[in-house]
Amino acid sequence: MEFVQNWDGYAVRDWMIRNVDVVGYISGIYLAFVFTGPKLFAKITGRDGATSVAPARQGGAGGGGSKAVRRAMVLWNLSLSVFSIFGTSTVTPTLVRNIMNKGFYEATCTFNDKEFYTTDVGFWIGVFALSKIPELMDTIFLVLQGKSTLPFLHWYHHVTVLLFSWHTYCVGSSGYIWVAAMNYSVHSIMYLYFAIAEMGYKHVVRPWAPYITILQILQMVMGCFVTLYAMQESHDGRGCGMTWSNMRIQLLMYASYLYLFSEMFVKAHVLPRWAPVATHANGSLKKSS
């Protein structure tokens, strides 16, 4: 595709460096919406809203909002799924080939700026970083569904990955291909799940929710491992194509996600199975919820 071949990641990077304040404004406006949007929408519509936390999305899927909102969400989620599938088909095979042909160290720690900022791989890495801005639309859709509050994990994940991606694309990172490959792969499945749920088939895909969350947790585990590996190589003197500031941010991001996604998984899928048995007044038993 011509627009992929003509991609100039260097120009995009330079623009992002010159306009680094823009990501601050976007993040500030987004956070203001997180805390005021649901209340404002509830006042306008006269509804109290409802909060529903879906395991994979940190915010609910399926059944809420008007028909127009649900249709828009189907198209939105399908678009993100298709986008992620295209990204996966380019970035993930490249990472796997690099590991098989060059070894884990070279694939993780050798920074090839030409591959990072140009070529078809560079295009999908670049648009991956930029895609964290439109992905904030997820939150707007949750508010339009009538959610009265937005889960911490939902908005924390969105705003931190946006800031991290902007920083990483500006400084360059040999490890960012791991971030893109894993995120693209998981999002290919996750957003398809949400699209099907919004079509009215939540009961069909619901059994797959815990497995999607497990994939997300494994993504965070691998992210922590890759970052710690890069830190170790940098400390031992062999070096790694990641700056220390970026590695620290990346480790903090992945470690916090690992904790939050694991906590969500336990609350959504483990604790309900071990809920205490309650006794009714008539002597019958039921599992408490």
UniProtKB/Swiss-Prot annotation:
Pathways involved: Lipid metabolism; fatty acid biosynthesis
EC category: transferase
Sites where a glycan is attached: 282
Active site (record annotation): 157 (nucleophile)
Main subcellular location of this protein, as a coarse class: endoplasmic reticulum
GO BP field: fatty acid elongation, monounsaturated fatty acid; fatty acid elongation, polyunsaturated fatty acid; fatty acid elongation, saturated fatty acid; sphingolipid biosynthetic process; very long-chain fatty acid biosynthetic process
InterPro entries attached to this UniProt entry: ELO_CS (IPR030457), ELO_fam (IPR002076)
UniProt GO molecular function: fatty acid elongase activity
Membrane topology: Multi-pass membrane protein
Cysteine disulfide partners in this protein: none
Catalytic activity: an acyl-CoA + malonyl-CoA + H(+) = a 3-oxoacyl-CoA + CO2 + CoA
Gene Ontology CC: one annotated term: endoplasmic reticulum membrane
Chain coiled-coil ranges: none
Chain location of the short sequence motif HxxHH motif per the record: 154-158
Transmembrane portions of the chain: 22-42, 72-92, 123-143, 152-172, 177-197, 208-228, 251-271
Keywords: Endoplasmic reticulum, Fatty acid biosynthesis, Fatty acid metabolism, Glycoprotein, Lipid biosynthesis, Lipid metabolism, Membrane, Transferase, Transmembrane, Transmembrane helix
Subcellular localization, as worded in the UniProt entry: Endoplasmic reticulum membrane
EC number assigned by the record: 2.3.1.-
Superkingdom of the organism of origin: Eukaryota
Function: Involved in the synthesis of fatty acids. Elongates C4 fatty acids. Required for the normal mitochondrial function, energy metabolism and growth of epimastigotes.
Protein family membership: Belongs to the ELO family.
Protein name: Fatty acid elongase 1
Lineage: Eukaryota, Discoba, Euglenozoa, Kinetoplastea, Metakinetoplastina
